[in-house]
Amino acid sequence: MKYLLISLALWLGMVGIHGTELELSETQRRGLQVALEEFHKHPPVQWAFQEIGVDNANDMVFSAGTFVRLEFKLQQTSCFKKDWKNPECKIKANGRKRKCLACIKLDPRGKVLGRMVHCPILKQGLQQELQESQCNRITQAGEDPRSHFFPGQFAFSRALKHK
């Protein structure tokens, strides 16, 4: 019975880790790369972190480019942050975990128009409202503010011209 429970726990652990992985599009992969670079530039971060799972990935096409929203988890490795791209960096078993929200706006050539990456330590929880407002600002990066039309906008303009 003991072996059955251990086997079940190991299997559930594997399904939990690998069963929820999302297949990312090329744009989403680029957004994740930008987010990881931005995270490792942050001065308080001293250790390298590796992505251990993507919970949610969305992208929307706008006139100025593509907006990518990613929710993913990171875990601390045994390497310093300058070596974060090193494939030999191993995840620390009791390393700190972070849950990240990244909002990236890329132009059609892949240039970054705007970015917001927030990765609190997992036990801190997310400050959802603040992050959402920051994410909404990134959504509009590079867009022409005059390209948004409001109901009745042209009806009033025409009525004024004919007088």
From Swiss-Prot:
Task: Identify the domain of life.
Answer: Eukaryota
Q: Which GO terms describe its cellular component?
A: extracellular matrix; extracellular region; extracellular space
**Disulfide bonds, paired cysteine numbers:** 79-89, 100-119, 103-135
Q: Does the keyword RNA-binding apply?
A: no
InterPro entries (UniProt xref): Chemerin, Cystatin_sf
Which positions are tagged coiled coil? none
UniProt propeptide residues: 158-163
| Annotated signal peptide | 1-20
- Subcellular location as annotated: Secreted
| GO biological process entries | cell differentiation; chemotaxis; inflammatory response; innate immune response; positive regulation of chemotaxis; positive regulation of fat cell differentiation; positive regulation of protein phosphorylation; regulation of insulin receptor signaling pathway
| Gene Ontology terms, MF aspect | signaling receptor binding
Modification after translation is described as: Secreted in an inactive precursor form, prochemerin, which is proteolytically processed by a variety of extracellular proteases to generate forms with differing levels of bioactivity. For example, the removal of six amino acids results in chemerin-157, which exhibits the highest activity, while removal of seven amino acids results in chemerin-156 which has slightly less activity. Some proteases are able to cleave at more than one site and chemerin forms may be sequentially processed by different enzymes to modulate activity levels.
Q: Which UniProt keywords apply?
A: Chemotaxis, Differentiation, Disulfide bond, Inflammatory response, Secreted, Signal
Functional summary from the UniProt entry: Adipocyte-secreted protein (adipokine) that regulates adipogenesis, metabolism and inflammation through activation of the chemokine-like receptor 1 (CMKLR1). Also acts as a ligand for CMKLR2. Can also bind to C-C chemokine receptor-like 2 (CCRL2), but with a lower affinity than it does to CMKLR1 or CMKLR2. Positively regulates adipocyte differentiation, modulates the expression of adipocyte genes involved in lipid and glucose metabolism and might play a role in angiogenesis, a process essential for the expansion of white adipose tissue.
User: What protein am I looking at?
Assistant: Retinoic acid receptor responder protein 2
Provenance organism: Cricetulus griseus (Chinese hamster)
